[in-house]
Amino acid sequence: MKKYLLLTFSLIFISCNTEVKTENLESDFSSFFKNGDIMTSATQDPLGNVFSYPTGEASITSQVKVWEPGFKSPWHYHPYTGVAYVVQGELTVNYDTETALDATGDEKTIVLSETYKAGDKAFLGVANTWHLSENKGSEDLIFIVSWLGEKDKPLAVLSE
């Protein structure tokens, strides 16, 4: 429901602001937008793995995720990396760096946890490592992720 309200208010805001000025454009919007890089020349994910582009036909999928407090994903892994940015709240990612990818039915164990907060720099999602993600905070978590995948290939593989 909150996603739909956010989308509705965004559309109302956009439709009410259809007039475009070309003079002093930067100063007109300086109170709304701050310029700055959220990721620059990233070559490694948070675990130190060097990322590479897919070998097949490249395909980018961008998603906005809104998770309520207490939400926890199932164990899964992504065959590809993605650029992620937390807009609101904090995202905790729990990694199992020891279980093989073909062990889909095996029990997973948290070996390492990383927490990313709103306002932090963007980060590369870890590819080919079992993990579960959660919102341990007291407010909705909103984050954006753009997956650098392959056409017609899954973005995630779930544990059984």
Where are these regions (language model features)?
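Extracellular/periplasmic catalytic domains that process cell-envelope and extracellular macromolecules
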Residues: 55, 77, 85, 108, ...
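A short, N-terminal "cap"/entry segment at the start of jelly-roll beta-barrel domains
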Residues: 16-64, 94, 104-106, 113-115, ...
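Glycine- and acidic-residue-biased ligand/ion/polar-headgroup-sensing regions
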Residues: 80-109
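Sec-dependent N-terminal signal peptides
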Residues: 4-14
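Conserved short histidine dyad/triad with adjacent acidic residue
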Residues: 61-78, 82-83, 115-117, 126-127
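Active-site-proximal beta-strand/loop segments in catalytic clefts of secreted hydrolases
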Residues: 67, 78, 89, 96, ...
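Ligand-binding loop in jelly-roll beta-barrel domains
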Residues: 100, 117-120, 126-154
